[in-house]
From Swiss-Prot:
Disulfide bonds: none annotated. Transmembrane segments: none annotated. PANTHER family: UPF0212 PROTEIN MJ0068, UPF0212 PROTEIN TK1194. This is UPF0212 protein TGAM_1344.
Amino acid sequence: MGDYVVVLEAPIIVKDVETSEDAINVAVSKVAKALNKENLDFVRVEIGYSQCPVCGAHFESAFVIGSVGLVGIYLTLKVFNAQSIEHAERIAKAVVGKALKRVPLKVFEIRELEEENGDGLEVPDEFE
């Protein structure tokens, strides 16, 4: 049995927005509200990033066309006592999917938490 950090990515559609900043704010608020309603305050919500195919630069995944925005969101959570990576993925999708019912969730990254001498778990810096 292992402990994992699972990062899921989710596309969030928002309406009646004019700029990508508006879309990001509305999307984060929408997701946080849905997660809090299900008492999932341990799930971290972050903006997704895309990579330019030409120059390789990273930019926020938020696009607005005709007052409708599409925002990529990363959802990070820790899964404890999973039997495998696949099991951790299923648990994470089930937990988050309970709050975001009609949002497709895709695994962006899964990392196993490392145990040091039985004294506890060490979380990589980018997950703190």
